[in-house]
Every structure is written in C-alpha cells, then in structure tokens.
Amino acid sequence: MTKKLDKLRKNIDDIDKKLLELISNRGLLAKEIGLLKDDGVIYKPEREAQVITKLIKENKGPLSNDSVTNIYKAIISNCRALEKKLAISFQVFHQ
C-alpha cells in the first residue's frame, strides 16, 4: 500500500506543478489583457459569469459545479488583482 500511496502522491505533485504553471500563464495573460483594456474597467462580471458557465458545462466531475465555481472565482480574482496592479502602476507612471 505504501508504494501505491507514494505513487499516487507523486502523481498529485506532478499535477500540482502543471496546474501552477498553467495558472501562472493565465496570470501573465491577465496582465497583458490589463494593458490592452482601453476603458480602464478591470472587473466585468458578465465575462466572469461567461467563463464559469463554460467551465461548468465542461465539468465531468468528480468535483461539483460549486467546487469548480469556487476554485475559478479565486483564480479569476487573483488574476484580476494582477490587472489592477498593472493599471494603477500605468496610471501613476503616466501622470
């Protein structure tokens, strides 16, 4: 059982590493999007709802739709914070 447990944990560690890389890439894209936004509006609830609705449709489990929603709201919120920091820095720099 210990070997199997170790193997499963190693698989989870590998997945976590990949997830972190993907989330970091998402954050970089959010920063880039922040630079391209002309209207200065960082939070667009309709876009967040669109992203989450699409993910729920793709969800095949085992996580519940509520779990997927909670996870992605946290990811989106933290990526939005990157956009906001960039927007504030841009405004201060160009005043």
What is each stretch, according to the model?
Residues 1-95:
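Domain-level signature for soluble enzymes in the chorismate/prephenate branch of the shikimate pathway
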